[in-house]
Amino acid sequence: MTHVEVVATIAPQLYIEETLIQKINHRIDAIDVLELRIDQIENVTVNQVAEMITKLKVMQDSFKLLVTYRTKLQGGYGQFTNDLYLNLISDLANINGIDMIDIEWQADIDIEKHQRIITHLQQYNKEVVISHHNFESTPPLDELQFIFFKMQKFNPEYVKLAVMPHNKNDVLNLLQAMSTFSDTMDCKVVGISMSKLGLISRTAQGVFGGALTYGCIGEPQAPGQIDVTDLKAQVTLY
């Protein structure tokens, strides 16, 4: 069984309000990583992100900071073209205080360009979470394993795969793919079966070799997320 860090996802509208700071502080003991979603901010800039990071830095000794721009293609609000998206991800390397950066994987990506950006982020001491999300369904087991395999070829620190289950077998396939991958590959793995049906993938993440589990602060930011305080308590049981 692996050690699991609890990620708390926040999605502020440009400014970090004092009420949000209070909510984070109230749950500080349950948070290992704070995920700052930025795709909900229209035409977000690096300078705007840097300002938010400065506000969060006050508490940063308590947790690592992950920045994520989730594109509409993978279930987020982000409307950037692929080039604008990749330029933003690359430029995040210059912001002090960011520990981890999410970069999406698709089957049709420019492999060489993706690798250059990932290497660039790592040269600035940013841990890379390469991720793929399917909000419609759960692919067959062999396809799940193939996606994990393709993502790990970029040598990231983490590979994350989140899929939508329609039955218990979908959940089992995701857990099996994650477990097999964690036993055979060097990078850390994250596997999420979304919605209430897949909640066990969040609470028992470590049993199947997972390294991160995502919760929320108040309103869920993805199907199946529960408050990080409850999530931490559940993860600790394992």
UniProtKB/Swiss-Prot annotation:
Pfam (any one): DHquinase_I
Catalytic activity annotation: 3-dehydroquinate = 3-dehydroshikimate + H2O
UniProt keyword terms in alphabetical order: Amino-acid biosynthesis, Aromatic amino acid biosynthesis, Lyase, Schiff base
GO BP: any one term: aromatic amino acid family biosynthetic process
Superkingdom in the source lineage: Bacteria
The protein's role, per its UniProt record: Involved in the third step of the chorismate pathway, which leads to the biosynthesis of aromatic amino acids. Catalyzes the cis-dehydration of 3-dehydroquinate (DHQ) and introduces the first double bond of the aromatic ring to yield 3-dehydroshikimate.
Description of how the protein assembles with itself and partners: Homodimer.
Entries under PANTHER family matching the protein: 3-DEHYDROQUINATE DEHYDRATASE
Protein name: 3-dehydroquinate dehydratase
Species of provenance: Staphylococcus aureus (strain bovine RF122 / ET3-1)
Gene this chain is encoded by: aroD
